[in-house]
A protein has these predicted regions:
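A short glycine-rich beta-strand->turn/loop micro-motif centered on a GG-aromatic cluster
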Residues: 139-142, 161-175
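Histidine-anchored nucleotide/phosphate-binding helix
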Residues: 39, 147-158
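Active-site flanking residues adjacent to catalytic metal/cofactor-binding acidic residues
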Residues: 8, 51, 167
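Short acidic-hydrophobic, aromatic-tinged amphipathic segments that line or gate anion-handling sites
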Residues: 191-199
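Extreme N-terminal starter segment of soluble prokaryotic enzymes
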Residues: 1-5
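Short, glycine/acidic-enriched loop or turn micro-motifs at the edges of active sites
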Residues: 12, 55, 171
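Active-site alpha/beta core segments
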Residues: 30-137
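Short glycine-enriched, charge-decorated loop/helix-capping segments at active-site entrances
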Residues: 18-25, 117-119
Length: 199
């Protein structure tokens, strides 16, 4: 019975300067790298990362010339082969260190918010990967608190993992949606500690 850290979508397009930037994302990326450096292999048996990785996600992107509604349609972001899809430079030391055991890409041809919708390079889901390594407890960090962190943590709990969100290591898009997400997570039995960065 082991514990894993799930790092959600710490990517260029979700940090300052990106096409769907979340204020505080770059600082959160650096803080997550510090956590990974201090705890990989000790507090956490495994560290995994998720990544938005869009090829042609259909209506997930707002049509050219139209404003996205920021609920079901979004600006173009994290397109495969672009700089925006890459992990943020502040997270690069964690990746370069070899501490990230697997990366789960999601959303190639449709909208995907939860890391549990993604697949690793071998086509394995996050739930399968964690179970095959006897992981029973997960801590979730990353971007954005009110979207992909929320969805990943809810799915982790639904999949039967004891789930904890380290809110100090998350960045939310807006206060209202973040508050709503936190209430939803509490109701689902997800343990929450700290306070998210919110613009």
């Amino acid at each position: 019975m082991h514990r894993a850290l799930i790092v959600v979508d710490v990517q260029n397009d979700f940090c300052e300067g990106g096409s769907l930037a979340v204020t505080g994302g770059a600082d959160v990326a650096a803080a997550i790298t510090d956590l990974v450096g201090q705890t990989a292999g000790t507090s956490y048996r495994h560290v995994v990362a998720t990544r938005d990785h869009h090829v042609d996600p259909g209506e997930h992107f707002a049509p050219a010339g139209e404003e996205p509604d920021y609920v079901s349609s979004w600006p173009v972001h994290c397109v495969a082969g672009t700089e925006g899809v890459g992990f943020h430079p502040n997270f690069a030391p964690a990746v370069a260190s070899g501490a990230i055991d697997a990366v789960f890409d999601k959303g190639a041809y449709s909208a995907a918010y939860s890391g549990f919708e993604g697949l690793d390079e071998n086509g394995e889901t996050l739930a399968e990967w964690l179970r095959s390594r006897d992981v029973t407890e997960v801590d979730v960090v990353g971007i954005a608190t009110d979207h992909c962190v929320r969805a990943t943590a809810l799915d982790a709990a639904r999949e039967g993992f004891r789930t904890h969100v380290l809110l100090d290591l998350t960045a939310g898009v807006a206060e209202e949606t973040t508050d709503r997400a936190l209430e939803e997570l509490r109701t689902a039995g997800v343990r929450l500690t700290g306070k998210p960065v919110v613009a």
